[in-house]
Amino acid sequence: MAEAASGAGDVTLEGERGKRPPPEGEPAAPASGVLDKLFGKRLLQAGRYLVSHKAWMKTVPTEDCDVLMTFPDTTDDHTLLWLLNHIRVGIPELIVQVRHHRHTRAYAFFVTATYESLLRGADELGLRKAVKAEFGGGTRSFSCEEDFIYENVESELRFFTSQERQSIIRFWLQNLRAKQGEALHNVRFLEDQPIIPELAARGIIQQVFPVHEQRILNRLMKSWVQAVCENQPLDDICDYFGVKIAMYFAWLGFYTSAMVYPAVFGSVLYTFTEADQTSRDVSCVVFALFNVIWSTLFLEEWKRRGAELAYKWGTLDSPGEAVEEPRPQFRGIRRISPITRAEEFYYPPWKRLLFQLLVSLPLCLACLICVFILMLGCFQLQELVLSVKGLPRLVRFLPKVMLALLVSVSAEGYKKLAVWLNDMENYRLESTYERHLIIKVVLFQFVNSYLSLFYIGFYLKDMDRLKEMLATLLITRQLLQNVREVLQPHLYRRLGSGELGLRTILELARALLGLLNPLRPDPRRHLEAQADEGGAGSRRCLGGGCGAPEEENEEEEEAAVERRPAGEGGEVPEGPRGGKEEDEEEDDDEDEDEEYEGEEGSLLDCGLRLKKVSFAERGAGRRRPGPSPDGLLEEGSPTMVEKGLEPGVFTLAEEDDEPEGPPGSPGPEPQTVLLRRARGEGRDQGPDGDRDTETGSGDAAGRQKRHNRSSWIDPPEEEHSPQLTQAELESCMKKYEDTFQDYQEMFVQFGYVVLFSSAFPLAALCALVNNLIEIRSDAFKLCTGLQRPFGRRVESIGQWQKVMEAMGVLAIVVNCYLIGQCGQLQRLFPWLSPEAAIVSVVVLEHLALLVKYLIHVAIPDIPGWVAEEMAKLEYQRREAFKRHERQAQQRFQQQQRRRREEEERQRHAEQQARRERDTGGREEARAEAPGPDPVAERGAAKAKGSERPRRPGALLPPGPVLRLKQIIPLQTRPPAPTGCAPPPRSPADTRLPAFLSLRFLKAPERGPSPPRPGKLFAFSAREPSANGAPGGGARAHRSAGDEPAAAEPEPRPEDAGHRP
């Protein structure tokens, strides 16, 4: 029997990927635990101990993973390989690992990136980072060219937060685009269409979400969730969850702080003005005017506070996106865009308008009619109850409570209807989609929440009844809201499917009352007594109804396995529990955990025992990893390279957790296990290598079932550790939708406070208490029960600010009408006629609107210091830009100068090389030719010299050559006596014209020299110059170009006849 059970266990293990959950139509297995009925098995076997946040401490942390991408368990290998190849080719900056989740039987991509790649991604994303003080301070978009100006850029751990890393990776994944004509199965992509959003919209990718960072999460649990009486760590929230979520909690905290004033003032009025009717009328009027002023001040002050936070987080002056991508859910006909000339989806606007007129509008009107009918039915029931004499006061409130319950339930239905209508209207952009969804939901909620109050106040004109109805709606809605957020959304799913009946609700109430009782008995003893009375073979715990057997049953099963005959192997099979010693140690550890954690720890231990049960039958089939002869896991494997995967894509985890067998058992297997044995083909072999015939049939069936679904992409089967990985646990959590639902709840509450609080002054106090709980419950929900959302950068709370401002204007009209029509004004001023009362109400309304407008104008939206800092930062940016432009221009000029110098140097080098080649060629030709004749060379040189054009100075005879400035005065001088040499002149005299020379003006007159026939100027053949050199001062001042002519040899007398 033991062998058969072991074989069956192997078959179940190998076929676990082929398992599917039972259809929803089939009845689920009965469970005795209340929490199991509420939450079910949706969160896998380990989902039952998610109630406690200490479940995080029991999971194996996931390292080297920022973003997790999971796929359904039915995804084929071709899809995984196609997407993996596109990611690695299209986004080489990412590091992708493929892993298989054992419990969910699904594949997942573990995505991360290096620090250098993240820096480039921050530059592409335009991520705003803090700038050092010496470079102007403030924040600006990151640039890799100027990375030195940013704070902490040298530190890899301090520069990027985990939320920023995940945002960069998400930006890359969303910008992975398809080429023209690409397709995956029946999904055909447009050119440049994002691949991953489209696959996620089609259901091929199950989810893409960032992974929690447990160290920071634990710190937030202590400083945020558990610190009830302290301020919220908004900066830490912004760094971890992003600006949008941090802005919501900042608004909620500011709203709660502002709610203190109307709560205190309303409580004082309610306490001291209930003596007589006149006091109540006065308090009603005063509190209505107070609420109008308070709501205006609150909204204006929040604008200033939001601007401060946006400036601090670097989103106040951030530029908007120039081009917004279409929604992945947008569908239409294919056409060529008239703007980009690329293929795109197009949905005609007339179809959307037709759907709005024929479907959306009629459904909205039908919903409003249904709300009105339900309201009238509850009011008729209320009248019937009030007509019966002698009923308790609590029974009189039952119709009001029923109406409040109907309003709360209808709100959920209306929200789903609004989402469906918005989807069917098929908006192209996400911003347009969100704006229309807000309009629909706000209109639905406004009518559904306030219709009964308007009916009582405007039609029945009964302030007492209005006060009771407002109190009932407000308190009931807040209680249901808190219960829903604490007990998880699965309660509603079970309620809708009929699995949550009256008996289960009573058991839940009894269990909650037992938890609140400090003197409650130990639930284990109660369950043991029930198990003994019923004779059940396995015990179930109250904490989760998980069906995990107790330790005694586990020990009995293991003892049965240990009593296996020696001929069947003779050794105790390896498994999670190798012997009784380990069982005792584990029991001692569990007892310590129970003593330390109390009831919460018992629930956690139940989940751990459940995991041990799920792996209890896998002990006989465990094997140690070893190298494969086929090279599947070897580095540089041809199989891996051929298929496009990296050798290290699969990670073997928990290899060192293999427990050793008892003394006498064989040691660890050698590391030469064949691939077939690593895949389970050698499991039915004994320690000596012989095949175990008893277990061969079961293992053969398991191998056959596994072979049918086996895939080469399957990673090697890891050690069967009972611990659950963090990534697998988070993939089972519910996704955090958005802040939309939270803002919607606060919008309804704000309307209750400002619209009708004059009838019930304690409404603000009830809202204050609810908000104090709401902050911590939302924080607890984000930190423990939901997946981590991607961070989004926003400037403010968006459209909700405008919606609440419109609510403030409407509050003035409603309160003034209630004052005029419900009798307060007539009772305070009985001498007023009806016409005068109406005029007084209109005047009061206009005065209130004027006061609201003056407050709006008087208080600027942006604080003065923020405006100054922004102006200073803008000035510094401009100056830095100018400085950058000058530096860039100087660098450009230097580059141009260096380029010209390099070109000039290259040109000179080429000329020099050419000159050397020519000189070398002439020398070679001269060396090859016979000896030259000196007379012939001299004649050739003369002929060449005569042919060469000469400058005018070279045509004159050698001797003292004067320039024009020396010639002009000589023409008017008398001829000098023969044989007298002219006085020497200094070089400075020859640089100035003669008529400007001081020496010339003071020199004595000289006689003209006798002219010589045939000569224009009286130049002697060889007249010594002033400096003793032939040629005079003119030749001394010749340019470099005249030097060759001056160096020419003196012609001989016999050649004088050849001169021109």
Swiss-Prot record:
Biased composition (Basic and acidic residues): 14-23, 680-694, 899-927, 935-950, 1049-1060
Extracellular-side positions: 266-281, 378-400, 459-745, 824-836
Keyword vocabulary terms for this entry: Acetylation, Cell membrane, Glycoprotein, Membrane, Methylation, Phosphoprotein, Transmembrane, Transmembrane helix
Carbohydrate-modified residues: 708
Transmembrane segments: 245-265, 282-302, 357-377, 401-421, 438-458, 746-766, 803-823, 837-857
Modification sites for Asymmetric dimethylarginine: 991
Biased composition (Pro residues): 972-986
UniProt feature, compositional bias: Acidic residues: 549-559, 581-602
PANTHER family: ANOCTAMIN, ANOCTAMIN-8
Identification of the protein by name: Anoctamin-8
Organism of provenance: Mus musculus
Gene that produces this protein: Ano8
